[in-house]
């Protein structure tokens, strides 16, 4: 039987070592591996990857600039998760507020990490009624 594909994100960062340290300290990420310039991390069992910017690759010339990707985190304590990130240097985004969804209230807010990546942080409610 063929295994289904798995999706993850790779975040382009200006300094991979600094980014690894920040994601571990601020978000509680654990390091899966580190090749120097490219690293694998995970939060809550969800893997993601960091890649140091390569100025010779035009697709990677704008770390910290405009992005059309947002990383989503689901936790029991969205307020605490965001506060920890902001205390470590992230920029506060939208405050955690309740949104009425088909399953009830979903609390969500966000921040921008020091490398320009947008994060939304919500409670686990989308997964409780499946």
Task: List PLM regions with ranges.
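Short, surface-exposed ligand-recognition loops at beta-strand->loop->(often short) alpha-helix junctions
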Residues: 11-15
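Conserved ATPase active-site switch/coordination loops adjacent to the nucleotide-binding site
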Residues: 115
